[in-house]
C-alpha cells in the first residue's frame, strides 16, 4: 500500500492544481469553502487516498514534497520561486555531500531546497542578520524535515573550501570577496537579484576577484492548458522574478 499516514504527519490536501492545503493529520475538522474535511479519517490510511468533505467534494491526500513546503511555508520575505531554484541547483551542481554557504536565509525557502539535496552527508551554512527571520526559518526547516542538515548563523562567513556559495542579498557585490575566500578552487557561485543594477555591480565584482565562467540568466515560466482540440498557453505566466548570476572560482596565481 505504500507509506501510511500517521497522526501528526503532514498531508497536502489536493483539490485542484490551484487549490492545495498543507495540514497535519490530527483528530480535528478542517474547514474549506468546499465543506469540512475530517482530518482524523486520514490516520492509518495510505498517501494518495481520496476523501470527501461534508459537501461531497473529493480531495486527494498527497505526501508533501520540498516544493510544497516552499510554497506553503510561513513568509516574511519574498521567496525565490521554484523555477529559479531549479536553475540554481543544476548550475551549481549541489548534491549529496555538498557543503554550501547561503547568505540571506530569509524564511528558509532556498535553504530548505539546498538542505534537501545535500542530504544525507552534506551541510548548509546559512547566514541571516535578522534574528526574527532565523526563528521563522528554523521552524520552516523543522517542518520540512531538513533542519538537521542546516547551521543557521547571523554574522560573518567562517567556512572555507566549500562547494558552493549562494547569495540572496540586497548588495551581493559586497560579499563577492568573502565568497571567493570561502570557495574551493573551481567552486560554484550564484546570486539572485531582482534588479539589473544589482546584477551589473555583482558581475563587475566577480570579474575583479578572480571568478570565471560568469553568466547571467532569467527564467520565464509559462503553463500550458491542455485540452483535446483546444490546447493553448495559459493567460497568465510567471514572468520576471529576478536575474541569476553564476560563476566559478579560478585560483589566483
Where are these regions (language model features)?
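Core SAM-dependent methyltransferase catalytic element
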Residues: 207-212, 220-253
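N-terminal auxiliary segments of SAM/dcSAM-dependent transferases
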Residues: 1-63
